[in-house]
Amino acid sequence: MSSTSQCGDLSNFIDHLYSPRMPARKELIQVDGREVAISNPEKIFFPQRGLTKLDLVRYYLAVAEGALRGAGGRPMALKRYVDGAEGEFFFQKRAPESRPPWVEAVELKFPSGRTASEVVLRDAAALAWIVNLGCIDLHPHPVRAGDLDHPDELRVDLDPGPGVPFDDVRKVALLAREVLGEHGLKGFPKTSGSRGIHINVRIEPRWTFPEVRAAALALAREIERRAPAIATSKWWKEERHGVFIDYNQNAKDRTVASAYSVRPTPDARVSTPLTWEEVPAVEPAEFTLSTVPARFAKLGDPHAPIDAESGSLQLLLDLSERQKTEGQKDAPWPPHYAKGDEEPVRAAPSRRKKK
């Protein structure tokens, strides 16, 4: 049996176990005129906080406008935690065949050559429907359903290494804002919901995935050049220190938890949009499933203007070309991608030395 068939069988089996049609208790909720069945609504999803699946659904409905701004209209893989945040999860790339007619799907082609029909959210009812499947956080691709080959978002993922103070993440985020601004782009920051910060940058959808990744790599290297003590663009963990700027999050088929995603942490932490004025003092632990709805109701969404701020990648791509003339060629890609012509040896330095 092929791995694709096995994955499909597993997904169908899980759908069967987790389907609202099972005799277990369910709750029917009305969302924008549509009926959504929530199976096992009292199932505990965050044991340390006593939060249930229904609490998770209600959270997403409370912040639906912001969550859909980040994830709506984009194909997305379903990261399903059928036993809650402390249980096992699996990525389901194929949209469930049993989905309602108002839940869209679009066919994607992956670097491996495989294809799959992935879910596209258009409204709050569809959002509630995928949360019922056990999706705690949302993982949309950086493209719109109408143009799957040209991303409209560059994603800056700041990932601190072990023991790195969060203040260094703040400093790198502010420097990233500076570099982006110098290259004609406006970044919108958010907590990652874990230990880092993400910066979303809307771009004109006219560059390919490799070009967007090249721009992200150029950005990462420039940040590292300006703050070498706390920032790194090095792919191999043994070469890293400080805050890693993960340029490969912009490679095709990579996804990042989107705005207002609840993360599978014990405290149900949320990847929360921020204003730049909040970044110097932000404390990620303050933003949880229990606290963010009130913040959203009071302050609105700091990312509300993002769709009006699409910029050009050309200046970052010009920077990339200058870096190449200085001897900085391509950097390693993730393991399952075909090796590029200019890519260095795809092996950690310590392994290369042994050969």
For every predicted segment, state its role.
Residues 191-201:
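Short, conserved phosphate-binding/catalytic loop or strand-edge motifs used
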Residues 59, 166-185, 212-227:
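Long, well-ordered alpha-helical scaffolding segments within enzyme catalytic domains
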Residues 200-213:
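Catalytic palm subdomain of template-directed nucleic-acid polymerases
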Residues 18-50, 57, 68, 72-73, ...:
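C-terminal accessory nucleic-acid interaction domains of nucleic acid-metabolism proteins
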Residues 10-17:
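Short hydrophobic targeting helices and cationic amphipathic motifs
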Residues 78-81, 187-193, 233-237:
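Short beta-strand
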Residues 23-32, 62-155, 159-162, 170, ...:
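SsDNA-processing nucleotidyl-transfer enzymes
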